[in-house]
Regions:
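Extended alpha-helical scaffold regions
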Residues: 1-156
Length: 156
């Protein structure tokens, strides 16, 4: 992560609300085995800064594995924060719920669970119609068509 990108990480952390920060910490701690997560320590340290100063980070985490590939660590922290925000806001918008349903349907289709896929798509279709989300409805119809084509080819 370049210095400019480092400021993006700092800006992202500073933009988080108190509840978003708490959610990130809970989200991140689920993926930790054993001792404290280095990402959380870095997150907390950056959060306490008034301005981004990478030299202070290097001094604070001196001789710790966290700094071995620091640009990768910062990039992963940035991406983990975005993933946690995605999970945090997943149920807050109808569009997010519909895209989640489409994603689940795609997974079920790829696993060969066609009846379950069809059920998820039917539910998403009702929700999209009810909320007048016609662009997403077209994607749902596309996946339903894929199901019908698959059923046609597997019947022979």
């Amino acid at each position: 992560m370049s210095n400019k990108a480092s400021h993006h990480l700092f800006d992202l952390i500073k933009s988080l609300s108190k509840s978003e920060k708490r959610y990130f910490k809970l989200y991140s701690s689920r993926h930790t085995i054993g001792e404290e997560n280095g990402y959380l320590r870095l997150f907390d340290f950056i959060d306490r800064m008034d301005t981004y100063q990478e030299d202070l980070i290097y001094m604070h985490f001196k001789d710790q594995p966290l700094l071995n590939k620091f640009s990768i660590t910062k990039a992963r922290l940035y991406n983990n924060i975005l993933k946690s925000l995605n999970a945090y806001y997943a149920s807050s918008s109808i569009d997010a719920q519909l895209f989640q349903s489409l994603h689940c349907a795609d997974i079920l289709f790829n696993k060969g669970l066609y009846k379950q896929c069809e059920k998820v798509l039917r539910s998403a279709e009702k929700q999209a119609k009810k909320n007048e989300r016609y662009v997403i409805l077209m994607e749902i119809k596309q996946q339903q068509r894929k199901l019908v084509e698959n059923e046609f080819y597997t019947d022979f």
